[in-house]
Design a protein with these regions (language model features):
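Amphipathic, charged alpha-helical scaffolds that flank and support histidine-based chemistry
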Residues: 514-522
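Amphipathic alpha-helical interface elements
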Residues: 1-323, 337-484, 488, 521, ...
């Protein structure tokens, strides 16, 4: 393509017309503000919210209905019968048109910038990530999503979020454009004529003007494309916001087998399940247990800042929560109705990928809690350890005035939150849990207070030895098994974080690491940790029994 042909297309604004006609309102992102100026091109986009009732009037002209800098609070003074009346308007005038983008100008004293309407940000509860200058929304699953991007002289917003906002406000979005092109070529050289073309469509009003350029040196031809394109919101019932109910999908889960041995599945939609109030009597009950491989919890343990796997409950911050039976010896079990009531469809599909045929019943702990209405302590070792540790720390501090195990820092808090019996035979998972437990029990020992409690202690004595000496001073002569456990855990932890040497091999042999699977080994380690805490509880605090946990 020749330079002259390229210039002809540019002056006729063919590329920009294609963008306006084919992409605005169809692309997933809408440019609601943009400003750029080069030697031969000036491009400006802006936007405003137009009441639905004003759409015919607005489309009657290609001029902008709100200019950059307008849409801020102001007053208008009216005169009637010689009397002046001043009224305040939130957006500066009384025509019902509102800004989506507000241009903040400080007359050169401070840098100007643009911001998105506060109402829009609050409507979608957007979080401003100041580092990347973007706004994030959160879906029903707790996943974050980019909603708006601000980059210098450009603002883009997700189309679907704009449209749901428009639907609720009963407004249209007007995307204004003003694009000016200049060329050194004459009209004759370009093969174009002076023109003023107006275009009107159901959602578009624009005008293209081409004429001689006689105002700037070296510019022979100029063109200007100015106008607006309107974007409507969907019908209110399709938005799923506020008071309308979304058409939520529900996954089906395996709940049993038929006489031929084939799997039987059923939807988890609570409205299609039986309950104790007589609903759907021929359907499976909402309390039908659904079984899952324990690996279903992997992604939740892997992100402790967002998820918390608790005794009988899975929590995604304050977004959602799911009751579950994680005290089961082999599986995770969830009631069918809870899957539909508490999980989004996206999360249901994740759980379904770990769904297996039922095998036996729910745990005794879950049965007592769910059907007998009784308080029941956890019996799965990782859950027991967390409960016992919490109680021990509280009781020890009440007696001695200081914690034996110092609280983990915010940066290390995940060690306790995500502590669990390994779900797989992956060595890295086992090592990470050993590291976490060692950080909780060994690296968190309150060495300063232990040293203060034993004044004659050798200054070179380290953590576990300090605890050993403290216990001896307290008259405990039967603590060697627990001290040995802590030393073995220390050696195992050293091998998990460094090259695995002789000390690690001895500790691994002590814990039976070569003879049993990783889950069984770490379960046994946690039992010894629970025994240690109960021993200290009984001998130094006078609480409970020091009898070892049953294996």
């Amino acid at each position: 393509m020749s330079d002259c042909e390229t210039e002809r297309q540019r002056i006729r604004q063919e590329r920009w017309r294609d963008v306006i006609l084919d992409r605005i309102g169809r692309d997933p992102w809408v440019t609601v503000y943009y400003s750029e100026r080069t030697e031969f091109e000036t491009v400006c986009f802006f936007s405003a919210l137009i009441p639905n009732v004003k759409v015919p009037e607005v489309l009657g002209s290609s001029s902008w209905d709100l200019t950059i800098g307008e849409g801020v609070p102001g007053t208008i003074t009216f005169y009637s019968g010689g009397e002046a009346e001043t009224k305040y308007y939130r957006f500066g005038k009384d025509d019902g048109i509102e800004p989506l983008i507000i241009y903040r100008d400080f007359h050169g004293v401070m840098p100007s910038y643009v911001e998105i309407s506060e109402e829009f940000r609050l409507f979608h509860n957007l979080f401003h990530d100041s580092k990347s200058n973007r706004y994030l929304g959160m879906d029903e699953n707790g996943d974050s999503e980019e909603i708006a991007l601000l980059d210098g002289e450009s603002v883009k917003i997700k189309l679907n979020q704009i449209r749901s906002f428009l639907s609720r406000k009963e407004m249209h979005l007007a995307v204004f454009f003003d694009i000016r092109e200049a060329s050194r070529h004459t009209l004759e050289e370009l093969g174009v004529q002076e023109t003023s073309e107006q275009s009107r469509q159901d959602n578009l009003a624009c005008e293209l003007c081409i004429r001689k350029g006689d105002l700037e040196p070296g510019v022979q031809t100029i063109s200007r494309l100015v106008g607006k394109k309107l974007i409507a919101g969907p019908p209110v019932q399709e938005t799923g916001g506020f008071f309308s109910e979304k058409n939520q999908e529900f996954a089906s889960f395996v709940i049993g087998v038929d006489q031929a041995g084939n799997e039987v599945a059923h939807t988890c939609n609570p409205k299609e399940l039986a309950n104790y109030f007589g609903a759907n009597p021929t359907a499976p009950h909402c309390l039908t247990p659904v079984f899952f491989r324990r690996e279903v919890l992997t992604k939740y343990y892997a992100n402790p800042k967002r998820f918390s796997v608790e005794d009988g409950y899975l929590r995604c911050r304050g977004v959602w929560g799911l009751r579950m039976d994680n005290n089961h010896a082999k599986y995770v079990v969830v009631f069918l109705g809870d899957l539909g009531a508490d999980l989004s469809y996206k999360e249901q599909l994740y759980w379904r990928s770990y769904n297996i045929r039922p095998e036996g019943g729910i745990s005794a702990v879950c049965f007592r809690r769910s059907f007998l209405g009784e308080f029941a302590d956890a019996d799965r070792t990782d859950l027991v350890f967390k409960s016992v540790l919490s109680t021990f720390n509280r009781d020890w501090s009440a007696v001695y005035g200081w914690p034996l195990f110092k609280p983990l820092s915010d940066a290390d808090s995940h060690c306790l939150v995500a502590l669990h019996i390994p779900l797989t035979e992956d060595e890295a998972e086992f090592d990470s849990q050993v590291l976490a437990l060692a950080k909780i029990l060994i690296e968190s020992l309150n060495e300063g207070k232990l040293r203060d409690a034993v004044p004659e202690l050798d200054p070179n004595t380290k953590g576990i030895s300090k605890l050993e000496r403290f216990l001896q001073v307290k008259g405990l002569t039967d603590c060697q098994a627990h001290i040995k456990f802590m030393r073995n855990l220390h050696d195992l932890r050293h091998g998990a974080g460094h090259r695995k040497g002789e000390a690690f091999q001895r500790a691994a042999a002590e814990f039976g690491l070569g003879d049993k699977n990783a889950g069984a080994v770490f379960d046994a380690i946690l039992r010894k940790a629970v025994d240690l805490l109960r021993y200290l509880n009984c001998r130094l605090l006078g609480v409970g029994s020091a009898e070892p946990a049953q294996t």
